[in-house]
């Protein structure tokens, strides 16, 4: 018996020694490279959601089935829509009740009152290994996060690049805690004690929370923010019940996009023609939408339709601009959309405080030698549903927020004391003016692979040059204000 026990212990010691030697050898091999590992933190929609992910029952979290079709049929909502378009009278509250019934089967993505996922919904691609093992992802799209990852992999090798996927609905602070574990693992795998963080859209909010909670770890070498939501977006004003629909604003929006949108994702020229052909129909729809969002009806619209669909998703609350948050929270408390002391309340107020500390946190990083770069878009109009529809934007996030403080002209206008040659931007009000770049005409995250727009992003993530406007301009052709032409070639803005 003693011999068997001794043999077992010796075998266990040998196995442990071999494992430790293998891990040490891997880390030692990684250390031979001077390449800093890059962790990319993507935005909303980068990772698809599934019910029962990674099981034989994996499927779409939203089911378009007889429940939905029966609701459409039973409510006769299609007939109401046709009457609205024709200019006939439809009672708003009756329509809201019908809309509530039709959308009931689409509520599965909403969270519970504590901001937690309901049911078995999540992502199927939480990869803890490098993108060297996920090369198919790099070719899944020629733009957005796959294109960003691909150019970084081209520059430093896919074995040095990791992608932190997450459920975009969840609280970004909880995501940041998971990111901390992820980065710890990356450091072990790579043999390096620092990483470069490249974040996109909502991912910038996750990184903001990570910096707030874990900056004392001193494990960030540089951080690059792309089209960031870290200071919110005016679309977040919808939580203030600010739903403003103006036909002129919609027409201006379509006209501006038809004139300046370069990518081929959406044909705004054709949409512009359709709007012109059905001008009366559009007017009737806008008039009815304004009835739905009137003071008399908007509470019912929110409580019956909007909030059951997405009102408990923490990350959407965390896209409210800092200065709008208190008023938005007060309005939603009055509406019963959130309760003081609930998990959702605690999560969104916690991130609001973090959002307010971002400047302090980034300055703290800079004092420790961390390189910072902020890239944002402008020259495209914001969605025409709030009072800030005229804001410069990348079609989703306002330039003033993505740049962390730039003063911007309304679409088609000029701003006083402009620092950009075209008169659209005054960057002197940015919190980090010397670390912020503006690209005109590029839609949100349209960093198309094979273009110099994409190469610029890859350069910021992997260069050894100092990340400030002057140093980058001296070392490259990249200046603080750039724009694209009809061939998607980026160059400096001159006028």
What spans do the regions from the language model cover?
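Sec-dependent N-terminal signal peptides
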Residues: 3-13, 18
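A generic structural signal for short, solvent-exposed coil/turn residues
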Residues: 6, 19, 155, 366-367
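Sec-dependent signal peptide cleavage junction
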Residues: 15-32
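Short amphipathic alpha-helical surface micro-motifs
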Residues: 20-21, 143-147, 354-357
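N-terminal non-catalytic accessory region
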Residues: 28-198, 204-257, 292, 296, ...
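Generic structural signal of hydrophobic/aromatic residues within well-ordered alpha-helices
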Residues: 68, 78-82, 253, 257, ...
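Alpha/beta-hydrolase fold catalytic core
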Residues: 159-166, 170-173, 295-390
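Alpha/beta-hydrolase-fold enzymes
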Residues: 248-335
């Amino acid at each position: 018996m003693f011999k068997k026990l001794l043999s077992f212990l010796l075998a266990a010691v040998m196995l442990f020694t071999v494992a430790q030697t293998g891990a040490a050898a891997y880390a030692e091999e990684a250390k031979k490279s001077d390449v800093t590992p890059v962790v990319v933190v993507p935005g909303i929609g980068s990772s698809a959601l599934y019910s029962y992910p990674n099981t034989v029952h994996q499927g779409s979290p939203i089911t378009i089935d007889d429940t939905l079709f029966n609701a459409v049929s039973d409510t006769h909502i299609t007939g109401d829509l046709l009457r609205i378009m024709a200019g006939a009278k439809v009672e708003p509250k009756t329509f809201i009740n019908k809309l509530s019934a039709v959308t009931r089967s689409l509520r599965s993505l909403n969270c519970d009152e504590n901001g937690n996922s309901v049911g078995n919904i999540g992502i199927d691609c939480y990869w803890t290994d490098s993108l060297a093992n996920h090369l198919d992802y790099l070719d899944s799209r020629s733009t957005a996060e796959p294109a960003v990852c691909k150019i970084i992999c081209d520059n430093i090798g896919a074995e040095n690049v990791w992608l932190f996927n997450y459920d975009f609905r969840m609280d970004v602070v909880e995501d940041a805690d998971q990111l901390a574990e992820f980065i710890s693992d990356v450091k072990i795998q790579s043999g390096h004690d620092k990483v470069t963080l490249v974040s996109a859209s909502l991912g910038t909010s996750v990184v903001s929370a990570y910096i707030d909670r874990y900056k004392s770890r001193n494990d960030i070498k540089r951080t690059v923010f792309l089209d960031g939501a870290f200071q919110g977006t005016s679309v977040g004003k919808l939580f203030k019940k600010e739903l403003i629909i103006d036909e002129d604003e919609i027409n201006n929006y379509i006209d501006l996009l038809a004139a300046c949108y370069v990518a081929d994702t959406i044909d705004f020229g054709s949409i512009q023609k359709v709007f012109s052909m059905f001008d009366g129909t559009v007017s009737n729809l806008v008039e009815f939408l304004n009835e739905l969002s009137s003071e008399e009806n908007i509470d019912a619209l929110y409580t019956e339709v909007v909030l059951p669909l997405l009102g408990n998703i923490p990350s959407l609350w965390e896209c409210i601009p800092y200065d709008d948050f208190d008023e938005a929270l007060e309005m939603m408390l009055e509406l019963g959309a959130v309760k003081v002391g609930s998990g959702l309340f605690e999560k969104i107020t916690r991130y609001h405080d973090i959002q307010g500390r971002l400047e302090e946190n980034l300055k703290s990083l800079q004092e420790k030698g961390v390189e910072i770069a902020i890239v944002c878009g402008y020259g495209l109009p914001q969605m025409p549903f709030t009072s800030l529809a005229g804001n410069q934007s990348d079609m989703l996030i306002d330039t003033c927020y993505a740049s962390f403080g730039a003063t911007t002209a309304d679409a088609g206008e000029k701003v006083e004391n402009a620092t950009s040659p075209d008169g659209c931007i005054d960057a002197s009000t940015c919190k980090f003016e010397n670390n912020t770049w503006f690209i005109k005409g590029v839609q949100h995250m349209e960093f198309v692979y094979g273009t110099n727009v994409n190469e610029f992003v890859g350069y910021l993530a992997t260069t050894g040059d100092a990340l400030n406007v002057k140093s980058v301009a001296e070392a490259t052709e990249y200046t603080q204000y750039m724009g694209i032409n009809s061939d998607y070639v980026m160059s400096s803005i001159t006028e």
